[in-house]
Amino acid sequence: NHMRFHSFCPPEAAFAAADRVGFYLQPEGPSWPNHGSSLGNGEPIDDYLWAEAERMVKAYGNHPSFCMMAIGNEPRGNWVEWVSKFVDYWKEHDTRRVYTGASVGGGWQWQPKSQYHVKAGARGLEWARQQPNSMDDFSDNRFILQAGTTPYVSHETGQWCGFPHFNERRK
């Protein structure tokens, strides 16, 4: 019952619907700053994301479904220091939700200030290292073990191609 919004914040209707049915939402700042930009290097995106986070919380912060927050997806640059400041700020200024700096793949650094981690590699879904399978031991996963006691949310595990057979549906 958790839904992550990859690099964006959904509209009011998503929060209202999630409040009604009991979904937990993780909106993110509109950022995937490893394609032409980066965090923590003094670029305009640094200030933009701070302001956008403030706008998100002001607009939707009272929705009970808005219980998790990240600033974006897979950053580069001096991002660990930048997202650590982001998490520290929000932990101090708004305790209504839990915070992680950014949602990241398995090769990205750990974010020491995050209250939970969104990281790839859970359940044997390590993309290039092994094929998806049902024999993975979740409790023996190297990423889970590295997270320690901090909660761990699997990153992008639902990104699998699906090719429907349209002749199977009723007309």
Model-derived segments and spans:
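Substrate-binding/catalytic cleft of secreted carbohydrate-active enzymes
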Residues: 2-171
